[in-house]
Amino acid sequence: MKQKLLYLAAASLLSLNVQAQQDGFFTSKLEAQKKFESDYLKAVNYDQFKVHLTELTKNPHITGTPENELVKDYMVQVMSQAGMDVKVWPYDVYLPNHPGKSELQIISPVQLTLSQKEGELAEDPFSTDPRLHLGFNAFSGSGDVTAEVVYVNYGTREDFMKLVEMGVPLKGKIAIARYGGNFRGYKAKFAEQNGMIGLVVYTDPKDSGFTRGDVYPKGPFYNETTIQRGSMLTLDFTGDPLTPNRPALPLDGPIKVKRDDPATVDFHTIPVTPIGYGAAKEILSRMTGTDVPGAWQGGLPFTYKLTGGADLKVRVMVDQKPDFIRANNVVGTFIGKDHPDEWIILGSHYDAWSFGATDPNSGTAMLLTFAEALGKLYKNGQKPSRSILIGHWDAEEQGVIGSTEWVEHLRKELGAKAISYMNFDGGASGRNFGASAAPTLKKLIIDASKEVTYPDSAKTVFEIWAGKNEEPGIGNLGGGSDHIAFYMHVGIPSLSG
């Protein structure tokens, strides 16, 4: 997998370094292109991917912690040794990097405290690390509420409309929703709009769990304690919530940036807590109302109900305090020999909710290995035509913050110089290749995939990826990762793999 990704990245990037004519290259450039690709493959030390990934994921490293600072320092060291001109870009951003206080309890008809922490597994020594936090969603509202429960399916706008149509009382109730169907933040937004006072969110086994196949650690699907974390922000912009469209420069720096008053920002007001489906089962199995519509039935072995009934009371307590946190982006540059003011940018975030072995640091490790290989060529005089920038972004998990601040900081320069942006958030996850891209870069991915042999196979990545189709599907770019500011704010052609 790592070989496949490293070469796909190189093939795509190096193709952008050659003057294109219609669907191919000028003849005078083609041989140089092929030689560069061949020399790059010889320069890659694939064992370094594992070395980097092991070092990057030694500790849980959420934004603003000393452990994340160690990751930043390691990346600076590796990229500098590879010959890149490396710069750290600091920003002071407003976010929560700790769950604060959080409790979830059934108050009646029994008293039961529900787990908000993933289970410890003998097969996974990392799961016992005492530094791992409770599961939490950044930018939950704070509050302590006790109320009856309503099952809101995925918590989409349509789900809430259906509940209203069925006459289910929502005001003053606590919602329990399964992940999927929409962005998690909108589950809270729609619950608030309907007068609900709290939200419990979980991944149902029908969507990822024992009904799909073997669960972790035996298989890839969620076990009963697995908790999905993430940002709840539903503002009209990404990045630091107090500095829309302007960089959150350091508070102690020479340039002062206007910051909005947090009290004026449209943060969520209701407490939200994520849990595993084992804990959710304790609530759902005690609900006594009307049966849910057929499409709303989940994977737990009982009939789901719309309401919990008057006897079932649940307490949700969250006390989460955002604060100003120093986020550091690390950007390295190889100066292009022919067009130094034309930039091809690759990036991945490096902050993680826990250890980050897949999301995001498989992408981080790939980019470090990539930098080392290009550095060998660069030192031998084989310089790319255009400048290549590699960015490692901080504070992505709380709302795609670090990369957005950098783009806001360099908006004019990026608009004038950036040729493309390639995002590798979680570069290696499973055995199947997939990508999404701007329309102008989709053919580039297809062409690159035809040049790469699939691991342990005589077929190309393209052939495995396409299967029985003439061509594989490449999705359009949406939200959720660091391509957003490049593509949607500045209009830089982007891809995400």
Features from the language model and the residues they span:
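Bacterial Sec-dependent N-terminal signal peptides
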Residues: 1-24
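Second-shell loop/turn segments in exported
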Residues: 35-43, 57-66, 103, 135-140, ...
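Short helix-loop-beta-strand segments that form the rim/entrance of peptidase-like active sites
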Residues: 51, 373-401, 421-424
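A conserved hydrophobic secondary-structure block that centers on an alpha-helix together
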Residues: 148-221, 337, 341, 353, ...
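Soluble metallo-hydrolase cores and metallopeptidase-like ectodomains found primarily
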Residues: 127-162, 238-358, 369-372, 376-382, ...
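Structural recognition of the beta-strand scaffold that forms the well-ordered cores
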Residues: 52-55, 87-88, 149-152, 174-178, ...
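Noncatalytic luminal/extracellular "stalk/propeptide" segments of secretory-pathway proteins
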Residues: 23-31, 54-171, 205, 217, ...
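Metal-dependent peptidase/peptidase-like ectodomains
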Residues: 223-291, 339, 393-496
